[in-house]
């Protein structure tokens, strides 16, 4: 689509609900009538498995296949490898081959922009492309940030997780300065929140006071719930697993927040083109 928005979901700390957010944000946007592609940019293939594909190493065409074809200057077929999921999202899966590919990528020409070459073509078919990054700042994550319009940072109200935000923000700033000047941070999403515990309240307040002036902290908070873990284990979104629960309600609200930001940015882009 002309106004497709590409969002990287990233945090250098694992276990913060990043993949769960990618799945449920994607399905929430589909429920709003948007066309959505999810890209699994992690060799652990958590996103692929969270959508029910439990044997990722048996999948013949994955992100590493597509990126290798770009390096080899082969004809780009953007439909290659995309899986259509029953909940309405499309998926470009990943598997362990991405680890070996990341090593080979170091010697490639324009190595930071290989994924961007693919995304620039495939995004013509979508309203949103969501990239689930691995919890590190390796070459694949840098590719994701180079290809993205914006970043969403899921983090849980835990001291070490919030502390790690500073390092992540510096990394995003470096990519913006050196590779992708259009990159912006849409906001920080608080996940696995236990509202009745003091530590959750204190850390949430600390993050908002530390970053809320220059970076948006989303109004929506994703509550802690075993149902979200169960849904991932079942290979389903929270909407398919527990549609009337509090986590589904939170992700529905979050999807609307993200869509609202996207619409504002689209309107701004249209205005800039008219000038």
Give the positions of each predicted feature.
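P-loop NTP-binding core
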Residues: 1-275
């Amino acid at each position: 689509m002309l106004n497709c928005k590409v969002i990287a979901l990233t945090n250098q700390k694992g276990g913060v609900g990043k993949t769960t957010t990618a799945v449920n944000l994607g399905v929430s946007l589909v429920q709003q009538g948007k066309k959505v592609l999810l890209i699994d940019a992690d060799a652990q293939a958590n996103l692929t498995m969270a959508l029910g594909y439990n044997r990722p190493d048996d999948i013949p065409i994955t992100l590493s296949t597509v990126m290798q074809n770009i390096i080899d200057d082969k004809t780009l077929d953007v439909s290659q490898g995309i899986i259509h999921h029953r909940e309405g999202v499309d998926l470009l899966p990943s598997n362990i081959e991405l680890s070996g590919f990341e090593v080979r990528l170091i010697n490639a020409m324009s190595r930071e922009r290989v994924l961007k070459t693919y995304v620039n073509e495939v995004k013509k078919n979508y309203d949103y492309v969501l990239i689930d990054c691995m919890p590190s700042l390796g070459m694949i994550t840098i590719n994701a940030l180079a290809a993205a319009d914006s970043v969403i940072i899921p983090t849980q109200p835990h001291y070490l997780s919030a502390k790690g935000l500073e390092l992540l923000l510096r990394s995003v700033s470096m990519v913006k300065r050196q590779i992708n000047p259009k990159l912006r941070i849409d906001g920080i999403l608080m996940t696995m929140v236990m509202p009745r515990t003091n530590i959750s309240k204190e850390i949430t307040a600390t993050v908002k006071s530390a970053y809320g002036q220059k970076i948006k902290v989303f109004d929506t908070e994703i509550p802690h719930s075993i149902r979200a873990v169960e849904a991932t284990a079942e290979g389903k979104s929270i909407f398919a697993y527990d549609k009337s629960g509090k986590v589904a309600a939170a992700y529905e609200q979050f999807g609307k927040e993200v869509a609202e930001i996207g619409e504002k940015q689209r309107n701004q882009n249209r205005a800039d083109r008219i000038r």
